[in-house]
């Protein structure tokens, strides 16, 4: 499970945690919702993006962290979300980081390629719903 998230060849590698004290281990999964007929297999399986929402695969990811001394575990299921590595794993990573950091996680815990996007999302969240994000910043709520 460690290699799924931390090895470049792992299906969850894009959702890894860089901070050595917070590294997680996990397993991606995809649950097929629909039947794929022999005729469809012969002509090529239709991609999730081209299917109606209710026929798309479910995305799954289970994980624990820190991997060397587990304190937290999570399971994320995104109904009709597609693949576990693209839909469920990033959500689980963010939940785990929030739990381990006790609030807003440090940007340095994310892969460098994600930091700009994550910083923008955190700022948008803070500006959109300041009363519900006070705990992200460690602020007291009145």
Could you describe each region identified by the protein language model?
Residues 90-142:
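Short, gly/Ser/Thr-rich active-site loops of penicillin-recognizing serine hydrolases
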Residues 1-106:
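Active-site beta-strand/loop architecture of penicillin-binding DD-peptidases
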């Amino acid at each position: 499970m460690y290699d799924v998230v931390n090895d470049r060849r792992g299906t969850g590698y894009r959702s890894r945690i860089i901070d050595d004290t917070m590294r997680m281990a996990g397993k991606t999964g995809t649950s097929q919702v629909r039947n794929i007929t022999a005729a469809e297999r012969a002509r090529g399986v239709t991609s999730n993006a081209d299917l109606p929402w209710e026929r798309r695969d479910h995305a799954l990811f289970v994980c624990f962290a820190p991997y060397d001394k587990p304190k937290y575990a999570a399971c994320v299921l995104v109904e009709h979300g597609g693949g576990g590595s693209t839909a469920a794993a990033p959500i689980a990573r963010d939940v785990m980081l929030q739990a381990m950091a006790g609030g807003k996680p440090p940007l340095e815990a994310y892969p460098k390629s994600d930091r700009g996007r994550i910083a923008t999302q955190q700022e948008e969240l803070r500006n959109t719903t300041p009363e519900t994000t006070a705990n992200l910043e460690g602020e007291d709520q009145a």
